Amino acid sequence: MTKYIFVTGGVVSSLGKGITASSIGRLLKNRGLKVTMQKFDPYINIDPGTMNPYQHGEVFVTDDGTEADLDLGHYERLVDVRTSKYSNVTTGKIYQEVLQRERRGDYHGGTVQVIPHVTNMIKEKVMRAAQMTDTDVVISEIGGTVGDMESTPFMEAIRQMRREVGSENVMYVHVTFVPYLRAAKELKSKPTQQSVSMLRSIGIQPNMLVLRSEMPVPQEMKDKISTFTDVPVDYIVESLDAPSLFDVPLSYQEQGVDQKVVDFLHIDSPKPVADMDEWRRMDERAKNLKYKTKITLVGKYVELEDAYISVTDALQHAGYLYNSKIEVEKIQAEDITEDNVAELLKDTQGLIVPGGFGIRGLDGMITSIKYAREHDIPFLGICLGMQMASVEFARNVLHLEDANSAEAEPNCKNNIIDLMADQRDQEKIGGTLRLGLYPAMLKAGTKTRECYDGQEVIQERHRHRYEFYNKYREDFEKAGMTFSGVSPDNHLVEIVEITDKKFFVAAQYHPEFLSRPNRPEGLFKGFIGAASGLQVDKF
């Protein structure tokens, strides 16, 4: 029987529910259990694919092409699982399916209401995730905080789950905030008490409390919280601010969180103890890196940390392999000109230009890529970064001065980057990109092939609607650009590189989405190796 863990949050947002869910998932996975991660987002958008990165942050992409919340990236990297369309559900997606069923007549003329139709759909999504992944445990994070109007249907649905699948198969984990008042020099438990009271008022009794705090929570306070919340004191866990995400699962294990979970849910785990030896080595490496490598990221959304979270994480993962801390300096692409590029990039050891949409900042990207190419600074381009590297090469090596991307200038004579054929008549924006996992054939004797340890075929995740215009391939190759990765039918350019440079590689796909702390993605591994000048130092 599948077990279900629901992670909710109270008091304030951004407490780290996703990190809590991921940490529990990692511990259970390392006990030999199959874990499925899931995120419910209460916004009415169908998915975050068309949302402004400044509002929502990065859009994460799964193997099956789902555009999802960035928390799925945390799940994949921390738990080391693959997520799917069953892993991210929004209010918009729920209502869309309910209304489609109503239009088909599936409700036989009945009045469609939040209860039972919307709540039933939410429960269906939870149980479908279990069925489609054949998992032991589904861990579902409920976005927002208890008391939010938007999350009410989700709270009601997970309340009903306990009755439908049995109390022995459901566990409620509530993440709450214990503020420290510096003036009074004391922690306050009242917000936690009120948050749990609100949760109980809608029929959910939490089985475990995770207390987020910047200071250790004394035992007397835990006893007090237990008295007011009816949560056994042994099931009250503290989650202190940590210097590294690696610390969180280890802290939970020290407090016996995984054992409490398997005891409460009556799980017979294949391993009696979670094997966290490799995790501890990663934690030790991350805290004691010997070297530093400075990387410059030139992008469109640099003001928001979460906009490139998978990219910056992937850079750090590669840094661990070389025992080097990666110091990422982010520069707004619009701020880069021919006059200041030398000053801005003079101290960098590597340049990365990640993905994005729209024409803003393209000239700055092209200028920075040109400087990196001419001064042999290691360069990695991703998606839009690959497209701008192609445009830069056309302008400054092939001397096609009007070369551009059709996204920036649709009627340009030399559109090096053009709209994909199946996108030309597309009127909708959302969910219509080339999305998900696709294969690429790698050319022998290239840096790309070397990055992937000699593999002939790789599978990577994509999110784009523009592609390299094939009529220019011969001219590019004659001028020194190598097409080191292409689709199996040789139609779509996946990777370009200048082989005689220290490292000048750009990919149409998003390599950052498959990077893991203990397994850095190939292009990031090659890029940081070239930028740092270091040898691999395994931990």
UniProtKB/Swiss-Prot annotation:
InterPro entries: Class_I_gatase-like, CTP_synthase, CTP_synthase_N, GATASE, GATase1_CTP_Synthase, P-loop_NTPase. One of its GO terms (cellular component) is cytosol. Transmembrane segments: none annotated. Gene3D superfamilies: 3.40.50.880, P-loop containing nucleotide triphosphate hydrolases (3.40.50.300). Keywords: ATP-binding, Glutamine amidotransferase, Ligase, Magnesium, Metal-binding, Nucleotide-binding, Pyrimidine biosynthesis. L-glutamine binds at Y54, G356, L384, G385, M386, Q387, E407, R465. ATP binds at S14, L15, G16, K17, G18, I19, D71. Homotetramer. This is CTP synthase. It comes from Lactobacillus delbrueckii subsp. bulgaricus (strain ATCC BAA-365 / Lb-18).
